[in-house]
Amino acid sequence: MGLSDGEWQLVLNVWGKVEADIPGHGQEVLIRLFKGHPETLEKFDKFKHLKSEDEMKASEDLKKHGATVLTALGGILKKKGQHEAQLKPLAQSHATKHKIPVKYLEFISEVIIQVLQSKHPGDFGADAQGAMGKALELFRNDIAAKYKELGFQG
């Protein structure tokens, strides 16, 4: 299920656009995630009180957390599948501390693709979307395997 060099290049090309505005992209990803899948908001004590999109947009903490999420994901994507060292602590915290189900990682993966489609239509055509989908699936599968090792049934 690995990606070809060409597919990784497509992923990293569009990720360069994300890195030009990590906080903005991260904020939009989290807002779309919380609006589309309100149950995910329950995992974030810091954001549970944010009920409207306007409140979410005004939250500096939400923007910062979105940047943290996408910065971590970018570090993983840049490893082109050789992400064991980056993945282990992430899986550990998401399994044992945050208890984030794999399903929620599927939700955020879908949202990331939607945000990239809306913000970068010229740089995120069908081939790039397919490549990003594969990269995010690889990430999720590897997280799920780590969850299993940790005894988390997420």
Curated annotation (Swiss-Prot):
EC number annotated for this UniProt entry: 1.7.-.-, 1.11.1.-
Modified residues (Phosphothreonine): 68
GO biological process: removal of superoxide radicals
Enzyme kind, highest EC tier: oxidoreductase
Binding site for heme b: 94
Residues found modified as Phosphoserine: 4
The entry's keywords: Cytoplasm, Heme, Iron, Metal-binding, Muscle protein, Oxidoreductase, Oxygen transport, Phosphoprotein, Transport
Ranges in coiled-coil conformation: none
GO CC annotations on file: extracellular exosome; sarcoplasm
UniProt keyword annotation of Oxidoreductase present: yes
GO molecular function, one term: oxygen binding
Subcellular localization, as worded in the UniProt entry: Cytoplasm, Sarcoplasm
Binding site for O2: 65
Matches recorded under CDD domains: Mb
Binding locations of nitrite: 65
PANTHER family, per database record: MYOGLOBIN
Subunit organization: Monomeric.
Role, per record: Monomeric heme protein which primary function is to store oxygen and facilitate its diffusion within muscle tissues. Reversibly binds oxygen through a pentacoordinated heme iron and enables its timely and efficient release as needed during periods of heightened demand. Depending on the oxidative conditions of tissues and cells, and in addition to its ability to bind oxygen, it also has a nitrite reductase activity whereby it regulates the production of bioactive nitric oxide.
Descriptive protein name: Myoglobin
Organism taxonomic ancestry: Eukaryota, Metazoa, Chordata, Craniata, Vertebrata
